[in-house]
């Protein structure tokens, strides 16, 4: 059994047999296809032999970069910048966004974008969906759909929660759909075929891009997902001296993100960003009040209340599938009641995803989280609805296409 909070109660890996005959494998020696695997990648982190790795897509990406008939663009998730530096001997939690962008350009990517932009769109849509449910008596609690490991766990354990799950796509998928729509313009693609890549801290993202509800008109919006460790391997093999290169900025028109988008990478970040979106004020006092509301911290379950339109809203933030399982049972039994629930499959959220550097403990969790929170402090834009590029997108490219590109039909079914 995997002894990590993300994969707790999944029973994917255990030690089978005894003594010299001991083998690490699926529980009860079952085939991987028959166990409740949610693709979270925590088995990689917990594997005692260090033998497990993610499915490697680096060669496919390299081949695409080397194809003159293709334009290859990449988006990078917030949590990646807080962990990539560890692969090159830098202090844990160091924000290496600038160096990462420069390295990706040297690897040959034509454009480098920031998934913070996608997170801002997710916050906008999730907040709007929540407001609509509260005002019009929709299904509550609304449960976040950003974590693909959680979504798959929900499919297998709690298909009856289908109507509670938000219809919003994840930041990766929203941004992937927007990028593909943007590059349909011949003046933008210059007659070349688009290859869309994302760099994620999460192995489950590799499966997410293949899900029918994550596609637009039956076509993948994101072609390949690379994990933090995969892109670190590409940088090393290319001979780039990561620690010595100067930082560069992401490309426009998707190069501006908010602090709310950055903290998506930490458990509680989605809830905190939504709270910022719902509040009318944006002063330091208002931001501090939200920050100290109980949404942050390393606890497996955090509960908080806030006022919206004269109504007391009850929210819960849970990380780790074992904790999520317990919370769902309490909700279904009537023991507790919430209006908004954020779930992240991995402990402390994306910063501890299965695609991040291995060997992480409490000190690493704290340092990576601090790296993102410190970045948020220095961000000029704190709220997603104050991101001028996102607002311009809604008035332009997204006009009349919001539901098609940013939402999905999350058909929760039993496997």
Task: Report residues per predicted region.
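Single conserved hydrophobic/aromatic residue that forms the stacking wall/gate
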Residues: 1-7, 11
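Residues immediately within or flanking Cys/His clusters that coordinate Zn2+
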Residues: 4, 34-40, 44, 140, ...
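Activation loop
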Residues: 6-7, 20, 100, 175
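Short cysteine clusters
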Residues: 8, 37-43, 47, 202, ...
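Non-heme iron-sulfur electron-transfer modules
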Residues: 9-36, 50-73, 364-370
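Iron-sulfur-associated redox domains of electron-transfer enzymes in respiratory
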Residues: 54-415
